[in-house]
């Protein structure tokens, strides 16, 4: 059979995937092993979709669509809907005739019209008996498989192939099905040839009939396609009258259509008629249908008798041969999935700076992997923490709808605004400032997580005495973006070298001064300008010299190097920043070889990050060393496990530590006394008994202990006594989430004379019922606040006073809320006014300084910077490396954030990113996404490029190779699957 193929826009609707968008492609008919399938190809590529047609067509409709064009609509038995538009009418008509033939089991009569009726009858006679058996088995098994929820369009191909095996029981049904075939062959044989000619002669009339009856058929299908009711009608004799009534209604409708059209109509019951053979739609078809339904019950029962055993095997076979992209799982089609991935972020109101930075950060594959794939306990992180909002948006950005994504963007903005108020409104902001704030805040959140994450023993190492099971999570900012530069100050007089190290997340580099005779300079030149040696006034402690030379070298390289190009200069006259539109060449590769030494550390490998994702135990000696060498607030990083480790971690301020610890223990004892006081109130005993705690302190033997042992004992006692109270205080705070693991809020609210070590300890004690401590804590606090004398009032008066105070607090809270709402409205109004004024000012600046900004294109104004001087060989080598990246420590361009506009106070930010998975460049302009060539990025952003992301060449090649291997494996699996189909 020569395959039929038509081209045009395609749309598919199914229960699993929903309705796809119109996509250019083609429908192709393929016949294999007596099974007819429809293969859908898309012009954009991807794995084709295959739909079974044999015994699976429900309706075929052809409608005109323009001049000499038609739209073909195909409905399958599971209500899947396929449409192809703008098809030439002749091709569409041929396809419709073929689908009608497949629908009515006249495939070979339609495809071989040259054969006579006798020849066709012989072919049908040899094939129908097997098909009738397959139809009975397929119909019965479809009812069973529908209960397992596996009704998919493409499932019928291997399904019928297994059940159609003669060795699986077709011999048993040969007798029952043979009777039906003998009765139905004459009508089909006699009608085959004239039916073919009739279809060719009356195309227009049949199209009109199909259009008029299409809606009526669609209304009846849901009621008719009820597998449960039909199964009961066949297996339960007491329910036969339901089937007879349904068949009678269908037959009456068919007879009426025969009288009106005079042609063979589309039979809505052909799916169910398959179990009784092909029906004779003549004038006496009504009685014949009823006798067939009632007389076929025994054979149907026999076929159902052996179905339960092979049915599970057939389902298993089905899953193996199914398209690999989703076994029995609802999935998004390739076309719509690709469209979702190419969706940007909505502009919330002058938030283009945020959208551009987020798109660039999300495109860093190693950064995203370190954030999402190391098992960070997100429930231990506060809901309003930036790292949690950031990761949530990263996970959902390609799979959620636009409204959900917009809400996630607002949460990210609010998380940053909570720390940096300048981003709280809707004013225009600088993209580099937002990037710096975002990276710093992410690092702080990771530090808090590692600091407060409670220790857990590593499986199999509980008995190791020298191991403290502390989980350390990798900070994505540190492993991917942070690098270290060593500044060496060299005295010119005596040669004394003083090294100083500094960590950076990005480099802010100056524009090189461009003189007219020279060609445009590149980012490589600006980077080399940053690292060039410079002189400065410096007083040498050794010789007293006043002049020194400073050299800058990389001490540790990053995976991704972020370069911020300073495109703004301050205008003293206008007191404004002017944008410099100077042209700067954007090379594909940068090299840092001239700024590295033999001791320069390479970037963290991808394997290193993966290993850090596992729970890695640290030895106690390593923990002590980290405590001692920590440059900032070492006391907050302590994790005490034993007296020995405590003694090692003590510093010179141990006496102050001891005083603070004793004060903390006394306060905790008082809190415990308040709890005891509440218990005594319930027993009508008023005194608050804290004497036992004091006696315990006195009898603890502190006098004979050293300071170290005394501190350890006090801390241990405080931990034992205060764990329930501190646990309740954490739960009672309204700003903390139930799934929060951070204790930073508690640390900030503690008095200065308290040691924050204890609050940062993990909660190892089982927490009591919060309800049992609510009244205790409130009563205790209320007693302290109002200074209620013990025993001076009765319990009833005290509770009444407490209720009155609580009502007063509620009223004050309502007033505070109302006032805050008014202040918020006033603030929003002020922001709107500021936005209007800023817009007017930007327009004025644009009109007044347009010529000035054009003039700034000629020269950056950096008089003292001038230009880098290279030898001819060095210049040629750098030029070659810009395209090949052959020099050591080369970095590859992967993203550019550009500012479109002539002034710094107005304009728009966009982002160009390289997608490693798609191996292509895309431009993200808020919600709009478009594909772009790398050469266009380099040429179009040479005057507007603001922030540049470069990835280390070895890291880039490794990620690219991994992605290519993954895609090759997927294509191989898809090819094997298509061959099996």
Curated annotation (Swiss-Prot):
Region called Disordered, residue ranges: 111-308, 673-704, 719-831
Motif (KEN box 2): 223-225
Post-translational events: Polyubiquitinated via 'Lys-11'-linked ubiquitin by the APC(CDH1) complex during late mitosis, leading to its degradation. Able to mediate auto-deubiquitination.
UniProt main location, coarse: nucleus
Active site: 352, 908
BP-aspect Gene Ontology terms: cell division; G1/S transition of mitotic cell cycle; protein deubiquitination; protein K11-linked deubiquitination; protein K48-linked deubiquitination; proteolysis; regulation of DNA replication; regulation of protein stability
Motif (KEN box 1): 32-34
Record's compositionally biased regions (Low complexity): 813-824
Gene name of the record: USP37
Motif (D-box 1): 71-79
GO molecular function: cysteine-type deubiquitinase activity; cysteine-type endopeptidase activity; protein kinase binding
Start and end residues of each UIM domain: 706-725, 808-827, 830-849
Record CDD domains: Peptidase_C19, PH_USP37_like
Protein name: Ubiquitin carboxyl-terminal hydrolase 37
Family, similarity comment: Belongs to the peptidase C19 family.
């Amino acid at each position: 059979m020569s395959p039929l193929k038509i081209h045009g826009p395609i749309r598919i609707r199914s229960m699993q995937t929903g309705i796809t968008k119109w996509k250019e492609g083609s429908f192709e008919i393929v016949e294999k092993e007596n099974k007819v399938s429809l293969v859908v190809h898309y012009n954009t590529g991807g794995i084709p979709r295959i739909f079974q047609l044999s015994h699976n067509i429900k309706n075929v409709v052809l409608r005109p669509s323009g001049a000499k064009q038609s739209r073909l609509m195909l409905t399958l038995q599971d209500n899947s809907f396929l449409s192809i538009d703008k098809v030439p009418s002749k091709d569409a008509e041929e396809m419709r005739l073929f689908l009608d033939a497949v629908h009515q089991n006249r495939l070979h009569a339609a495809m071989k019209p040259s054969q006579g009726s006798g020849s066709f009858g012989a072919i049908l006679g040899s094939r129908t008996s097997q098909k009738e058996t397959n139809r009975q088995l397929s119909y019965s098994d479809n009812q069973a498989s529908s209960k397992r929820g596996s009704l998919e369009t493409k499932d019928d191909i291997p399904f019928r192939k297994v059940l159609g095996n003669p060795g699986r029981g077709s011999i048993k049904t040969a007798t029952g099905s043979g009777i039906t075939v003998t009765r139905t062959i004459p009508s089909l044989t006699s009608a085959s040839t004239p039916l073919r000619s009739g279809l060719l002669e009356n195309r227009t009339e049949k199209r009109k009939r199909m259009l008029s009856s299409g809606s009526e058929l669609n209304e009846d299908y849901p009621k008719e396609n009820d597998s449960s009711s039909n199964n009961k009608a066949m297996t339960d004799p007491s329910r036969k009258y339901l089937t007879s009534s349904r068949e009678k209604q269908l037959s009456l409708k068919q007879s009426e259509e025969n009288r009106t059209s005079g042609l063979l109509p589309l039979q809505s019951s052909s799916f169910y008629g398959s179990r009784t053979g092909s029906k004779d739609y003549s004038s006496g078809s009504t009685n014949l249908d009823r006798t067939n339904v009632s007389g076929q019950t025994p054979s149907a029962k026999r076929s159902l008798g052996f179905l339960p055993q092979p049915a599970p095997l057939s389902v298993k076979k089905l899953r193996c041969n199914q398209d690999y992209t989703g076994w029995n799982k609802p999935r998004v089609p390739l076309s719509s999935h690709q469209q979702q991935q190419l969706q940007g972020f909505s502009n919330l109101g002058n938030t283009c700076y945020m959208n551009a930075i987020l798109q660039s950060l999300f495109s860093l594959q190693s950064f995203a992997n370190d954030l999402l794939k190391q098992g960070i306990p997100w429930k231990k992180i506060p809901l309003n923490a930036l790292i949690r909002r950031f990761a949530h948006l990263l996970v959902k950005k390609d799979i959620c709808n636009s409204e959900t994504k917009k809400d996630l963007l607002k949460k990210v903005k609010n998380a940053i605004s909570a720390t940096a108020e300048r981003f709280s409104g809707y004013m225009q902001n600088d993209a580099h400032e937002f990037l710096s704030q975002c990276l710093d805040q992410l690092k702080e959140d990771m530090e808090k997580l590692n600091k407060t994450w409670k220790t857990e023993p590593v499986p199999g190492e509980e008995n190791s005495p020298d191991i403290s099971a502390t989980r350390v999570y990798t900070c994505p900012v540190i492993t991917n973006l942070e690098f270290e530069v060593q500044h060496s100050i060299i005295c010119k007089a005596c040669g004394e070298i003083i090294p100083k190290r500094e960590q950076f997340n990005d480099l802010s580099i100056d524009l090189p001064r461009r003189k007219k005779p020279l060609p445009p300079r590149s980012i490589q030149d600006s980077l080399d300008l940053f690292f060039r040696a410079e002189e400065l006034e410096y007083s040498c402690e050794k010789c007293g010299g006043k002049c020194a030379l400073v050299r800058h070298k990389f001490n540790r390289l990053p995976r991704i190097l972020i370069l911020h190009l300073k495109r703004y200069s301050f205008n003293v006259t206008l007191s404004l920043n002017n944008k410099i539109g100077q042209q700067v060449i954007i090379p594909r590769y940068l090299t840092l070889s001239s700024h590295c030494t033999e001791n320069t550390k390479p970037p963290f490998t991808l394997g290193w990050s993966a290993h850090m994702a596992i729970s890695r135990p640290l030895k106690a000696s390593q923990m002590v060393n980290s405590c001692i060498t920590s440059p900032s607030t070492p006391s907050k990083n302590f994790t005490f496990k034993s007296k020995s480790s405590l003694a090692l971690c003590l510093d010179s301020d141990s006496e102050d530590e001891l005083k603070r610890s004793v004060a903390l223990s006394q306060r905790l004892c008082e809190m415990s006394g308040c709890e005891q006081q509440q218990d005594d109130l319930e027993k009508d005993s008023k005194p608050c008994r804290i004497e036992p705690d004091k006696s315990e302190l006195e009898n603890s033997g502190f006098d004979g202990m050293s300071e170290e042992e005394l501190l350890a004992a006090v801390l241990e006692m405080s931990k034992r006594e205060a764990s329930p109270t501190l646990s309740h205080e954490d739960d009672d705070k309204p700003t903390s989430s139930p799934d929060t693991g951070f204790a930073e809020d508690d640390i900030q609210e503690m008095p200065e004379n308290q040691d924050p070590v204890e609050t940062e300890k993990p909660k190892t004690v089982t927490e009591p019922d919060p309800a049992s401590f609510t009244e205790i804590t409130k009563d205790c606090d209320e007693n302290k606040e109002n200074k209620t004398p013990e025993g001076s009032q009765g319990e009833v008066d005290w509770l009444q006073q407490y209720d009155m105070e609580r009502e007063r607090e509620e009223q004050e809270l309502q007033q505070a809320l109302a006032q805050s709402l008014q202040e918020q409205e006033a603030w929003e109004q002020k922001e709107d006014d500021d936005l209007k004024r800023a817009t007017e000012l930007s327009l004025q600046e644009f009109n007044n300084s347009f010529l000035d900004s054009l003039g700034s294109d000629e020269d950056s104004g950096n008089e003292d910077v001038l230009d880098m001087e290279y030898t001819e060989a060095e210049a040629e080598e750098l030029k070659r490396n810009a395209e090949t990246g052959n020099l050591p420590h080369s970095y590859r361009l992967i993203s550019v954030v550009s500012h479109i506009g002539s002034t710094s106070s107005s304009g728009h930010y966009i982002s160009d990113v390289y997608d490693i998975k798609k191996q292509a460049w895309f431009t993200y302009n808020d919600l709009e996404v478009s594909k772009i060539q790398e050469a266009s990025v380099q040429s179009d952003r040479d005057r507007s490029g603001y922030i540049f992301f470069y990835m280390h060449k070895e890291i880039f090649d490794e990620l690219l190779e991994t992605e290519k291997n993954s895609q090759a494996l997927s294509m191989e699996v898809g090819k094997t699957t298509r061959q099996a189909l």
